[in-house]
Amino acid sequence: MLTVFISFVAFALVCMTGFAFGETTSAIANSGGYTSIPEAVRDFYSREVLFQAQPRLRFAQFAKVKRDLQAIRGKSIVFVKYNNLTGGGSLEENDVLTPEAMSTAEVVVPVKEQGNSTQVTEYLLRTSLLDVLGDASRLLANNMAVVLDGQFRDTVLQTTNVIYGNGKKSPATLTATDYFNTVTVKDAVEILATNNAPRINGDFYVCIAHPHQLRTLRDDKEWIEANVYMGRRQLYIGEVGMYNGVIFVETTQMPVLDSAKIQEKYGSGATIKTGYEAVFFGENAYAWAIALDVELRDDGVIELGRKHTLGWYGIWGTGIIEEKNIVKALTA
């Protein structure tokens, strides 16, 4: 089989530092009577996947990205953290300054194959009034975004730093009226600041939350809608507002837990029927280790050209870099 790689520029994701799709790959080129996907069309749809996926991605724009596996073979990517220096101070004229050794810690992020595909028939391509390939690319784009965002979400929610709605101290005391409010935000900021978690761009912490959670917070008079300050800097994808030095990103990807799930995650003492999880974090909170950027691929000839498979494929992994830089919140 002849494999053709078609590169394209990730122009639609300039606002997401370090994020790019890879190449478009075709399993075979064939000049038979079936409707193949010509190079120009494949290139167009690879760009379409890139564009369509962007609005759904929330976590990727804040991840620390590394692609070392493209140069060094292996199944993991290592992120190196420098430990803080502990010495230093005033000196007398005759004091000898003894250099302090630098020390590091490693965060190992395993990578795995990721992907999904869909299949269309030759008959459908020839007879449908719809743009079948365009529809397929949109479905794949949305699926890729949901998968990637879900992996980031599940990674950061592994943190052991937990707060509860309305200042409650345990899941057992949480009630159906303990919403995500100003007390919740201040509790999270206190923990992050106490842990010396660096702010994003030295300016703010980030919270990614469900729309239900942010509804109550928006009623506070100190809440600032994103459209008020949008001219001062470029907004992040999904950013809806700011409060108390925290910017808020809204997404339905954040978990909505029933009572069984709440008790499974937080213990049998929890009594609320429905719970919502949100996450706060600062700089260098979590990692995205990429061995192969996302590609749009077609599977060539199947059943004499009667079927065509189109899918996305990549190799990556996610992991926590600094757990102290992450706080999760369970609220009603």
State each model region's role.
Residues 7-15:
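Single-pass alpha-helical transmembrane signal-anchor segments in small membrane proteins across taxa
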Residues 21-62, 174-187, 218-332:
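Sequence/fold signature of self-assembling virion shell proteins
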